[in-house]
């Protein structure tokens, strides 16, 4: 019997969970565009950095940016809308992972730079994407065993590391953008500070709707002021083409070489930890239970998007932590807002003029908004860690030492360039890579594999709450996750009386593919 993803209100009527609510079109457009603006700087910086390092021409660089935006849109729609058992059906934006930047540059320079280097990179990206996609289809028991590597102490640490590592990215934008001739000029900090203050005032004093679009309004207001003062340049809009279509294998047929493939597989292992943490974090923010099948669907979307990225001249994809911070700030939980953002990104990828308008937002303005969002990402990680018993010395050591490792590349970069070869340095010279690896290894040393209920055992609570109806129709494309009250502690009892667990009846949560208990959101 088909199960409806719904929750019961106090009068017994079914109501749609906020995640599955389709907002009116004007709100969808506004909220979706806000996600695009929040995501844009982080999205385009990877092709810019990689393309510049490989000495691509300006025209080739523009093509990379448009291809990235186009693929980001498709990937985000797959993740948020869902296709059968692919996609988490949560408000998760997909973007190119920063973790892959150094390895891709190393691969590209090793291949001689230019478009020939892109072909080697794309071969590795396609292979790693297919491998990730295949991994996420492991049998439920095997997949749950792997997911036990990521209890809250690991996912919370990784999300916190992401926020801490990303904050300097926002601050560099606030200073005018790395490499700009006037980097560090006071006017950039003035734009950043003014934008940040505008956002904070709206969040504090604005009505709920204004608060929910505070980032968008802050970016618009900051850009308007910069334009009036002559610091927002829209000249490139007129020079850009109206239409720019992304075609598969634009630069040629990919080349598949073993070492770049191995390097990219390691990168995807780290992005899997990122996506797992982001999935649990956004599930916690929106009040939607996350189990092992939800994580598997999110990782399948990652793998599919990464393989598609290699075909469409882009790079590896991950659930973007920046937009998790935005969901937390705005409290807009609908996944269809992300679908709308995906449509906007596809349009931007097809319309270079539209992309040029967004690109005209000054660095200082972007930096002010980005710093707020990245700080919220770190806070989401800290919130997850709040559900971990940090009074236990072993957990405190896992978090503290992992954070210390994550800061190593930023504080002592010479260690990697001076004492490691280029290939190893490109892999380890990343705060996210070191922090995530340290968290996983230290957790295994101190805690071993987590129990199946390490993320709160919502499935056990669902059984106690009653009536689990399984929807086993494959490829239905509907969200089969019903809503149960959130666990109030990280380790909920495996079974409690229904009367004590929930005074009001609620639809139980059953997994489409696996009726057995599995990990859930912290």
Task: Map each language-model feature to its residues.
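Membrane-embedded alpha-helical modules
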Residues: 109-232, 340-456
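Short, non-helical or kinked segments that cap or interrupt transmembrane helices
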Residues: 63, 85-100, 146-154, 210-217, ...
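N-terminal signal-anchor module of multipass membrane proteins
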Residues: 2-92, 99-114
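Hydrophobic transmembrane alpha-helices of multi-pass solute/ion transporters
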Residues: 12-14, 18-22, 30, 198-201, ...
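Juxtamembrane interface elements at the cytosolic ends of transmembrane helices
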Residues: 5-13, 43-47, 51, 194-205, ...
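Terminal cytosolic tails of multi-pass membrane transporters
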Residues: 431, 435-501, 505-522
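Hydrophobic, membrane-embedded alpha-helices of multi-pass small-molecule transporters
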Residues: 26-39, 43, 184-196, 213-214, ...
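Membrane-embedded helical hairpins/re-entrant loop segments and their flanking transmembrane helices
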Residues: 25, 51-89, 263-335
């Amino acid at each position: 019997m088909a199960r409806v993803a719904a929750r019961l209100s106090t009068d017994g009527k079914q109501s749609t969970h906020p995640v599955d609510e389709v907002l009116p079109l004007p709100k969808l457009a506004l909220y979706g565009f806000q996600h695009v603006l929040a995501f844009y700087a982080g999205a385009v910086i990877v092709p810019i950095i990689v393309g510049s390092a490989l000495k691509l021409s300006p025209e080739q660089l523009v093509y990379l940016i448009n291809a990235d935006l186009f693929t980001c849109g498709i990937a985000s729609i797959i993740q948020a809308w869902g296709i059968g058992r692919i996609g988490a059906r949560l408000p998760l934006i997909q973007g190119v992972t920063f973790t892959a930047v150094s390895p891709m540059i190393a691969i590209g320079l090793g291949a001689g730079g230019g478009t020939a280097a892109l072909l080697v990179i794309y071969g590795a990206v396609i292979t790693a994407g297919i491998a990730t996609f295949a991994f996420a289809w492991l049998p439920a028991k095997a997949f749950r065993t792997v997911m036990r590597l990521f209890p809250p102490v690991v996912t919370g640490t990784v999300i916190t590391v992401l926020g801490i590592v990303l904050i300097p990215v926002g601050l560099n934008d606030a200073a005018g953008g790395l490499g700009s001739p006037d980097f560090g000029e006071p006017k950039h900090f003035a734009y950043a500070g003014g934008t940040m203050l505008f956002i904070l005032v709206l969040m504090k004093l604005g009505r709920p709707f204004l608060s929910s679009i505070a980032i968008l309004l802050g970016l618009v207001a900051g850009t308007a002021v910069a334009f009036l003062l002559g610091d927002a340049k829209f000249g490139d809009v007129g020079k850009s083409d109206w239409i720019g279509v992304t075609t598969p294998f634009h630069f040629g047929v990919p080349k598949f070489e073993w070492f770049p493939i191995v390097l990219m597989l390691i990168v995807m292992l780290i992005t899997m930890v990122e996506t797992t943490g982001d999935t649990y974090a956004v599930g916690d923010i929106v009040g939607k239970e996350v189990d092992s099948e939800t994580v598997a669907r999110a990782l399948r979307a990652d793998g599919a998007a990464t393989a598609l990225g290699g075909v469409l001249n882009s790079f590896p994809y991950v659930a973007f932590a920046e937009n998790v911070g935005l969901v937390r700030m705005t409290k807009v939980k609908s996944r269809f807002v992300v679908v709308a953002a995906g449509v906007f990104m596809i349009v931007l990828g097809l319309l270079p003029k539209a992309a040029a308008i967004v690109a005209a937002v000054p660095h200082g303005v972007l930096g002010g908004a980005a710093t707020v969002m990245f700080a919220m990402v770190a806070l989401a990680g800290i919130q997850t860690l709040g559900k971990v018993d940090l009074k236990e010395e072993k957990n405190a050591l896992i978090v503290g030492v992992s954070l210390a490792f994550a800061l190593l590349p930023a504080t002592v970069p010479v260690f990697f360039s001076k004492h490691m070869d280029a290939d190893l340095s490109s892999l380890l010279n990343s705060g996210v890579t070191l922090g995530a690896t340290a968290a996983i290894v230290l957790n295994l040393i101190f805690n071993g594999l987590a129990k199946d209920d390490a993320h709160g055992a919502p499935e056990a609570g669902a059984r106690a709450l009653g009536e689990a109806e399984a929807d086993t129709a494959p490829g239905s494309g509907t969200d089969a996750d019903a809503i149960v009250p959130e666990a109030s502690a990280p380790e909920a009892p495996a079974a409690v009386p229904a009367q004590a667990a929930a005074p009001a009846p609620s639809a139980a949560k059953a997994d489409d593919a696996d009726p057995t208990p599995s990990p859930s959101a912290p």
